[in-house]
Amino acid sequence: MRLSVLLSLLPLALGAPAVEQRSEAAPLIEARGEMVANKYIVKFKEGSALSALDAAMEKISGKPDHVYKNVFSGFAATLDENMVRVLRAHPDVEYIEQDAVVTINAAQTNAPWGLARISSTSPGTSTYYYDESAGQGSCVYVIDTGIEASHPEFEGRAQMVKTYYYSSRDGNGHGTHCAGTVGSRTYGVAKKTQLFGVKVLDDNGSGQYSTIIAGMDFVASDKNNRNCPKGVVASLSLGGGYSSSVNSAAARLQSSGVMVAVAAGNNNADARNYSPASEPSVCTVGASDRYDRRSSFSNYGSVLDIFGPGTSILSTWIGGSTRSISGTSMATPHVAGLAAYLMTLGKTTAASACRYIADTANKGDLSNIPFGTVNLLAYNNYQA
């Protein structure tokens, strides 16, 4: 879809009031990951009136792919070079960023152990100890490939609430697996939480940053319509190259009253170069294995807040089945579920959950931790 702006947006348009011009063009940020051709995210300045965004949209011939009004004001659309130039001159535009590809952070392997580890001070245990409140009254949004809500492990507590594709069905399995680690009956950390699926990735586990932002924008609004008296968590087991707009959206979702847990990434590299992992205000999760080693694939660096079990994690899968896979994608829902569990107990809030989890973590237990990276492993501190 190619968008064009009516001449009334241009200062030289005859008979029309000129749009105030800026002294220099708004920044155009190049994608650091795999670029989506001619696709852009346009972010309006903080404090810009929604009416300014709406007025600009009315002057566009065609419909944007996404309009953002919650995590920030802006839109995503296919634009030609001239349109980008016009929008960069708009006084209310903060920046324009090229859209990029985002993918799941998972890989295949075998066997369950993560639940036992987050309720123990040492590795090698086989029992998960937890308070029977188990996250009841909390809600967790799984922003992913969808959730197979009919899976018996979810006991009717899961539902799909938004999709950006032709179908809301999870045709991949990744989202269902993550949701299972958050809150399924057998494999979940918070076994009584409500699970809401937001499908932002396709059945190949791939998507675009503009759609990820749309999903976060949706959650920032939708949470107000849900009954979640103990708190709201969002789990994002996905990522790509660094993106200012994705980080901004994640930060705003966090500040809106949602605990945001994100995957550090599977590149065995510094997470500061990836998004949303590099956003400082969200909870960035690295992966560990059953022997308390940093998983060989896990990203690291100063932006990490916590590690969670991420190698060979057994959980729910599509078709009413189960599967064991690995990735920081698997570590993230452990922490998201733990946040929901702790919020139900009144131990913390969405605003402080990541810091609380870090403060009460098992400290110094992990090996293969690079310099400058936290050595903290998530722990529920359950006392029988």
From Swiss-Prot:
<dbReference type="GO" id="GO:0005576">
    <property type="term" value="C:extracellular region"/>
</dbReference>
<dbReference type="Pfam" id="PF00082">
    <property type="entry name" value="Peptidase_S8"/>
</dbReference>
<feature type="propeptide">
    <location>
        <begin position="16"/>
        <end position="105"/>
    </location>
</feature>
<protein>
    <recommendedName>
        <fullName>Proteinase K</fullName>
        <ecNumber>3.4.21.64</ecNumber>
    </recommendedName>
</protein>
<keyword id="KW-1015">Disulfide bond</keyword>
<keyword id="KW-0732">Signal</keyword>
<dbReference type="InterPro" id="IPR034193">
    <property type="entry name" value="PCSK9_ProteinaseK-like"/>
</dbReference>
<feature type="domain" description="Inhibitor I9">
    <location>
        <begin position="39"/>
        <end position="104"/>
    </location>
</feature>
<feature type="binding site">
    <location>
        <position position="365"/>
    </location>
    <ligand>
        <name>Ca(2+) 2</name>
    </ligand>
</feature>
<feature type="binding site">
    <location>
        <position position="305"/>
    </location>
    <ligand>
        <name>Ca(2+) 1</name>
    </ligand>
</feature>
<feature type="binding site">
    <location>
        <position position="121"/>
    </location>
    <ligand>
        <name>Ca(2+) 2</name>
    </ligand>
</feature>
<keyword id="KW-0106">Calcium</keyword>
<feature type="active site" description="Charge relay system">
    <location>
        <position position="329"/>
    </location>
</feature>
<dbReference type="InterPro" id="IPR037045">
    <property type="entry name" value="S8pro/Inhibitor_I9_sf"/>
</dbReference>
<dbReference type="Pfam" id="PF05922">
    <property type="entry name" value="Inhibitor_I9"/>
</dbReference>
<dbReference type="InterPro" id="IPR015500">
    <property type="entry name" value="Peptidase_S8_subtilisin-rel"/>
</dbReference>
<dbReference type="GO" id="GO:0004252">
    <property type="term" value="F:serine-type endopeptidase activity"/>
</dbReference>
<feature type="active site" description="Charge relay system">
    <location>
        <position position="174"/>
    </location>
</feature>
<keyword id="KW-0645">Protease</keyword>
<feature type="domain" description="Peptidase S8">
    <location>
        <begin position="112"/>
        <end position="384"/>
    </location>
</feature>
<dbReference type="InterPro" id="IPR010259">
    <property type="entry name" value="S8pro/Inhibitor_I9"/>
</dbReference>
<dbReference type="InterPro" id="IPR036852">
    <property type="entry name" value="Peptidase_S8/S53_dom_sf"/>
</dbReference>
<comment type="similarity">
    <text>Belongs to the peptidase S8 family.</text>
</comment>
<feature type="active site" description="Charge relay system">
    <location>
        <position position="144"/>
    </location>
</feature>
<keyword id="KW-0479">Metal-binding</keyword>
<dbReference type="GO" id="GO:0006508">
    <property type="term" value="P:proteolysis"/>
</dbReference>
<feature type="binding site">
    <location>
        <position position="280"/>
    </location>
    <ligand>
        <name>Ca(2+) 1</name>
    </ligand>
</feature>
<feature type="binding site">
    <location>
        <position position="282"/>
    </location>
    <ligand>
        <name>Ca(2+) 1</name>
    </ligand>
</feature>
<dbReference type="GO" id="GO:0046872">
    <property type="term" value="F:metal ion binding"/>
</dbReference>
<dbReference type="InterPro" id="IPR023827">
    <property type="entry name" value="Peptidase_S8_Asp-AS"/>
</dbReference>
<keyword id="KW-0865">Zymogen</keyword>
<feature type="disulfide bond">
    <location>
        <begin position="139"/>
        <end position="228"/>
    </location>
</feature>
<comment type="function">
    <text>Hydrolyzes keratin at aromatic and hydrophobic residues.</text>
</comment>
<keyword id="KW-0378">Hydrolase</keyword>
<dbReference type="InterPro" id="IPR023828">
    <property type="entry name" value="Peptidase_S8_Ser-AS"/>
</dbReference>
<feature type="signal peptide">
    <location>
        <begin position="1"/>
        <end position="15"/>
    </location>
</feature>
<dbReference type="InterPro" id="IPR022398">
    <property type="entry name" value="Peptidase_S8_His-AS"/>
</dbReference>
<dbReference type="InterPro" id="IPR000209">
    <property type="entry name" value="Peptidase_S8/S53_dom"/>
</dbReference>
<keyword id="KW-0720">Serine protease</keyword>
<dbReference type="InterPro" id="IPR050131">
    <property type="entry name" value="Peptidase_S8_subtilisin-like"/>
</dbReference>
<feature type="disulfide bond">
    <location>
        <begin position="283"/>
        <end position="354"/>
    </location>
</feature>
